[in-house]
């Protein structure tokens, strides 16, 4: 989304059940199709687990038992431990290069882990993709395409072969598309493999969240504005993408929450930020229901030991909800 920094914010969301929207301490579950009953327990509730953050984003669960997420305006990455404790995992000093000092959003955004468990970061303020090494230093994986600076990398996902896919809208630039520091004439979806950066998609105006299907045959990418779309692309054997098709169009849907982060579960259901909260889609693109929150949602991530808890970051808070199906996570 438009904010990418580090902050300690976790939203515990427990799932709500029953045919009618059921309200919990953090929100409610809107059930639109009986298929949702196989995903969300009947009496699950959305739980708010932490609050007081400044636009938390990019959550990722670390296997040793904690959640990391960016607090974009504060330029920090926060660490939340079940039980409620929040600490700073990576402070502003990691994001205070000259570029970030004049950025519209100075810190990190999307976060993920590679096969070695190293944190990989969309450092949107510094317009680059970095990796946090075991000794604490940051390695720049990429900051340019054909010699031109990225706009402001937003979200990212690893494929099982180790290649990294990411989106690059202009939200981190002070004037976004009209910013004089913008070097690329488009907002792209890119792939990093073997140290090489490849442009995959350039016809989306503001690509944002992205996630693979369980078999990695498809890559889902949403477009935040002005057209609010969830797109699906066939992944070719060489890792590039075929032509995109519209998976779901939000054109006629009211609400200020544009598509942002997304995740997929092991059965192929998609959980995508959208108007009112987290929209849940079947693999065929049927809208099964919505996790409705009073705050604007930015992203989500699978957590806990069994991978069945969906953590949600929103305007100032962290939520979670316990589901029946485990998610795909790094």
Indicate where each model-derived feature is located.
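Sequence-structural signature of mature extracellular/luminal beta-sheet repeat domains
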Residues: 18-330
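Bacterial N-terminal signal peptides
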Residues: 4-15
């Amino acid at each position: 989304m438009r904010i990418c920094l580090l902050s300690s914010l976790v939203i515990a969301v427990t799932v709500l059940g029953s045919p009618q929207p059921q309200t919990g301490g953090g929100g409610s579950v809107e059930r639109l199709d009986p298929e949702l009953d196989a995903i969300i327990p009947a009496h699950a509730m959305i739980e708010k687990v932490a609050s007081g953050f400044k636009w938390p984003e990019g959550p990722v669960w670390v296997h040793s038992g904690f959640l990391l997420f960016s607090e974009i305006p504060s330029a920090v990455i926060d660490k939340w431990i079940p039980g409620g404790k929040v600490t700073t995992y990576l402070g502003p000093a990691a994001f205070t290069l000259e570029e970030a000092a004049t950025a519209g959003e100075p810190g990190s955004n999307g976060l993920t882990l590679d096969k070695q468990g190293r944190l990989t970061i969309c450092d949107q303020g510094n317009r680059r993709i970095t990796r946090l090494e075991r000794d604490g230093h940051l390695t720049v994986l990429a900051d340019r395409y054909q010699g031109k600076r990225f706009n402001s990398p937003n979200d990212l996902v690893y494929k099982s072969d180790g290649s990294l896919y990411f989106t690059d809208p202009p939200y981190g630039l002070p004037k976004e598309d009209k910013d004089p520091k913008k070097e690329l004439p488009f907002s792209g979806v890119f792939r990093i493999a073997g140290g090489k950066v490849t442009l995959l998609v350039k016809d989306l105006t503001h690509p944002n969240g992205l996630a693979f299907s369980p078999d990695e045959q498809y890559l889902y990418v949403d477009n935040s504005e002005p057209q609010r779309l969830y797109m699906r692309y066939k992944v070719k054997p060489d890792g590039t993408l075929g032509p995109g098709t519209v998976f779901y169009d939000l054109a006629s849907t009211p609400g200020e929450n544009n598509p942002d982060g997304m995740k997929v579960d092991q059965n192929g259901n998609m959980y995508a930020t959208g108007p009112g909260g987290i929209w849940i889609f079947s693999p065929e693109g049927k809208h099964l229901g919505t996790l409705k929150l009073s705050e604007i949602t930015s992203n989500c991530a699978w957590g806990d030991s069994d991978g069945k808890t969906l953590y949600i970051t929103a305007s100032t808070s962290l939520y979670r909800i316990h589901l029946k199906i485990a998610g795909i996570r790094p």
